[in-house]
Amino acid sequence: MFSILKLKSLSISHRLRGLLLLAMLTFMSATGAAESVRPFTLGSLAQVLDARAGKPFILVFWSLDCQYCPTELKMLSELKRSHPALDIVLIATDSVSDTPQLISRAESYGMNNVEQWVFAEDMPERLRFEIDRRWYGEVPRTYFYDQKHQRESKTGLINKKFFEDWLARNAVSSPGR
């Protein structure tokens, strides 16, 4: 009888270790994924701008629910492939709890190699106010920053010609030029 109880407890012990290992691997995977999308809080815009001092870049606000975002993000992915020096920053207006879906969606659009952030404030209105007092949360919302960080904003789907003209004006060339 003792050996049967010992065998049952050993079996339970093995199961618990297996579950613990699975939980640890899941946590490590989620932690690694979460590191690729940073929390966007008050002051984060200043970090984005400071990291790009004197350099042109495109800042894109998007959401998982956005009807036009897939089209714009796919177009930006194509432009990034043809202009590797193009600096794009994605900021999702969703919540931090959506991070796994944001990573997956960005990857599906070919945007997994760009800097990504997600709104991480209880009151997103405060973030929008800090970003642009005239912005009320509609997406996609795209800001085109030149070398002096003068910006031009566009709401909605932007045509490829506008992007290409901006790239030419801001000397973001493609390989071989």
Region spans (language model):
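Bacterial N-terminal signal peptides
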Residues: R17-S29
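N-terminal "domain-start" segment that seeds a small globular fold
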Residues: A30-L49, N113
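Structural microenvironment flanking redox-active thiols in thiol-disulfide oxidoreductases
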Residues: T71-Y109, P124-L127
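Thiol-/selenol-based redox modules, centered on thioredoxin-like
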Residues: V139-R177
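Bacterial N-terminal signal peptides that target proteins for export
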Residues: F2-L20
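The canonical Cys-X-X-Cys-His
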Residues: C66-C69, T142
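Short, internal strand/loop/helix patches
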Residues: A106-V139
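Short active-site neighborhood of thiol/selenol oxidoreductases, capturing the structured segment around
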Residues: A51-Q67
